[in-house]
Amino acid sequence: MLTYFPWFFVSVLLSFAACASAFVGTPVSIRASLKPSMVTMSASDSMGSLSRSDAIKTAAATAAAAGFVFSNSFPAMADGPYILPDLPYPYEALEPYIDAATMKFHHDKHHAAYVANANKAMAGKTAPSLLELQKDAIKAGTRNAGGGHYNHCLFWNTLCNHDSSGSPSPALAKAIDEAFGSMDEMKAQFATTAAGVFGSGWAWLGCTKDGKLAITGTPNQDNPLMDGAACTAMVPILGLDVWEHAYYLKYQNRRPEYITAFWNVVNWAVVSENYEMYASQGKGVPVVG
């Protein structure tokens, strides 16, 4: 399931590029006006779709050349119980490891579509918290949209500017050493899992029921909190989005390079808190959304 890049937006940007030469030197900014509902869902995110990938790159380049304004994200006006929260940092905060264009499209379009679809799925029903929704996400629509919303909220919260990345807390560092032998070995196993996710999905570091750290991968927008997920059951404290839209603008088909870069922007203070306050006690990590 993928929230595909809005094709109408692509065509607008490409049309604008054709006219841009007539306005050289003129300050121009473009503000995306698509509603989240205009972003469609699909069951796969093929890396081999060159025409779509090229269009994504071309549109992003056009936006940058035209002076696209990458301002801070904003919370979406919710048409239901769930909202799109602000990013906890500017779009460009993760540069050069994750680019501003990717962050803007990923948050404002892809994540927003999951929020919109989660609200549609819960229309007329008593909506649980986003964390509780993960445990009850049985139906495909609820599972995909609710999982996509929770996964992205956790993802954004565990990232930060490289200068603020820090290190795991003593408690988390000890748990990592006990489970994997070393930090480097944990990263190596995580990278293998993330690179091995077929098509679209996530890689997770989390705490199992026996209190030990483990690594697992999930397809689509599943996560280890969900009943019936094809993965190791655990409370995730850190996740990496390996859907194509999370990295293609900058890394194209070089997923391993994206995975390596990811470690430069992990917010270890937040991940440590996720472990100590929640996962190590068997509690799911709550998120605002």
Which residues does each predicted region cover?
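An amphipathic alpha-helical core segment
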Residues: 192-252, 258-266
